[in-house]
Amino acid sequence: MKSKSKIFFWTLFDFANTAFSVIIVTVIYSKYFSNYVAGGKNWLWGLSVSISMIIAALLSPPLGAIADVSRNRKRFLLIFTLISVICTALMFYVQKGDVLLGIVLFILANIGFEAGLVFYDAFLPNLTEKKNFGRVSGYGFAMGYIGALAVLLIIMVLLPAETSPDYIFYVRLSFVVAAAFFLFFSIPLFLFVSEPKLSLQLKKSAIRIGLQKSGRTLRALFVHKEYPSISRFLLAFFLYNDAIITIIAFASIFASKILMMTDEQIIYFFVIVQSTAVAGSFIFGIISDHIGPKKTITITLVIWLFVVVGAFLVQNVFQFYLVGLSAGLSIGSSQSCSRSLMALLTPHEREAEFFGFYDGLFGKSSAVVGPLFYGIIADLFNQRFAALAIGIFFLVGLIILQRVEVPKYKKEETAAEII
């Protein structure tokens, strides 16, 4: 590895940004907005998520191309991080009836969070040798889940009983805590992780060239089919990541409606998931470096198929916790190995551009399709059948993944030689 300290500082950003995804998207703000601010109108929360993800999906490919041309990935990451942090902190002022303010702040914060991931992921090929992509990517996701556990423990201590007259105030204060956590632990990356010096000379504006490159890449991938393995992988990733995002989004709803679990039980469930996700990220990261990310992803997708079948059959809280253990092992490893496989497939000096399609057009847009599909099945039948139906996405994604050809690499080949 080039520098263990730089890798550690890079993984700290994963540690930092999970404060937003856990507190705002998954556990606290989502319920606060739906039940308290919007008066139980859950569709408004779904609309907010969909709008933010669509915008982030459309922005990510051109932003990635611009970052490659301008060689300012860190600057772009800083800008989007600050947008997310500031808007998250301002959510403290969202109170009952402030629906428009709550929607706008969340959309901006989530765009900042999601768009920033394009530039964060694009650092990976510059940090380590190609043979270590799986392990380092796994470290990042493991740190993310450790961060999630840390911020959940802080919030559990911060929040009083739900019957307390100050409960709503401390819920709002938790948004400020999430913002501060995100900001503080992201600082080391900006101070200590440098970008490689590249010699591209620009005669046109970076924005113009970036947009042109983004258009050419889209045509190269899906019209001229110059990168068939990347095209197939992106399609497979779209499908199985869609399923993963949907399961995350509806896990608490499934638990409360099917098993009548309390909020406290649901929080403990997420603690279990995050804990096993840490182990899964480390274990499968090491496995990935030995057998390759494609085979490792295949293993995790098979586990996911067992998870959705388990959710369909589960009858009590204990069984649901066991399903959560399996999901936790798979969730971090599926995503970390996908990131390392994308890094292996991506042409050198075009990392941010291609990660723009990976994280953006295919990663973020999948957050729109899956939840809608789940909701329709749940309304037509029930939550159990909806969970089982999500297995279709895993199965088809698994089949397409097998057609992805992974390039061979030599053990002595370093990232410096690649890029």
Regions found by a protein language model. Give the residues of each.
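Juxtamembrane intracellular "pre-TM" segments in multi-pass secondary transporters
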Residues: 1-7, 194-235, 419
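Structural signature of the two symmetry-related core transmembrane helices
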Residues: 75-90, 295-310
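A membrane-interface helix-boundary motif in multi-pass transporters
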Residues: 158-180, 376-394
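Helix-to-loop junctions at the C-terminal end of transmembrane segments
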Residues: 58-72, 280-293, 378
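Helix-loop boundary and gating motifs at the non-cytosolic
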Residues: 2-53, 229-269
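Hydrophobic core of transmembrane alpha-helices in multi-pass small-molecule transporters
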Residues: 87, 98-116, 319-333
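Multi-pass alpha-helical transporter architecture, strongest
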Residues: 7, 93, 181-192, 388-419
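Central cavity-lining transmembrane alpha-helices of secondary-active solute carriers
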Residues: 45-65, 271-283
